[in-house]
Regions:
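Short alpha-helix in the Rossmann-fold core of NAD(P)-dependent oxidoreductases
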Residues: 1-4, 75
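Surface-exposed alpha-helical segments enriched in charged/polar residues
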Residues: 2, 39-43, 88
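A short helix->loop->beta-strand "cap" motif at the edges of active sites that frequently abuts
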Residues: 5-11, 50
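Alpha/beta-hydrolase-fold catalytic nucleophile elbow
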Residues: 14-15
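Oxyanion-hole/transition-state-stabilizing segment in secreted/luminal serine hydrolases
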Residues: 18-19, 125
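Substrate-gating cap/lid alpha-helix
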Residues: 19-55, 76
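Conserved catalytic region of serine esterases and O-acyltransferases that act on ester linkages
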Residues: 47, 70-73, 77-154
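The feature captures the short pre-catalytic strand/loop hairpin that immediately precedes
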Residues: 59-69
Length: 154
């Protein structure tokens, strides 16, 4: 990274969202891990002069409307918002409405919450646990989309 910065490249580092707003025990454990991770990212960004994108500075990132149903990754809207945040942080043209808060999430009836959670356990939780036990990654065997460095024109 230092070599990249010395070469004149613009380097941006990203913090992860520490607090999703969830009140579960797992969310508390992840929050502690993410806080430690982000402390290192912030330190390195400061040391090397990298641009830092930290979603923890804005409460709008905590909205569940940005998260894929796997509860781990961003969905299309979340990726769009991150892209706009990157452009804004780089002082490039961007959609100025990217910070506009989403409407409050709809509170599902208890039966729907249970159904949604069971679906998540079957589709994502159990497969994740099996991969962990087998010491496999969901990315094992996948080829990169861009196997060689690629220049992107603005």
């Amino acid at each position: 990274m230092r070599a990249l910065i010395k070469s004149g490249a613009t380097v941006m580092l990203f913090c992860v969202l520490e607090d999703s707003g969830a009140k579960t025990r797992a969310a508390k454990v992840w929050k502690l891990r993410f806080e430690a991770f982000n402390a290192n990212v912030r330190k390195i960004a400061g040391e090397v002069g990298a641009i830092l994108l930290d979603p923890n500075q804005e409460s709008s990132w905590r909205h569940p409307g940005f998260i894929h149903e796997d509860r781990l990754h961003l969905n299309s809207l979340g990726h769009y918002r991150v892209a706009q945040a990157v452009l804004a942080r780089l002082n490039l043209p961007h959609d100025s409405s990217w910070r506009t808060p989403l409407p409050p999430p709809v509170k599902l009836p208890l039966g729907e919450q249970i159904k949604t959670n069971l679906r998540w356990i079957i589709l994502y939780g159990i497969p994740w646990a099996i991969r962990r036990i087998r010491k496999k990654s969901s990315g094992d065997g996948r080829s990169p989309k861009y196997p060689a460095p690629t220049t992107w024109k603005p």
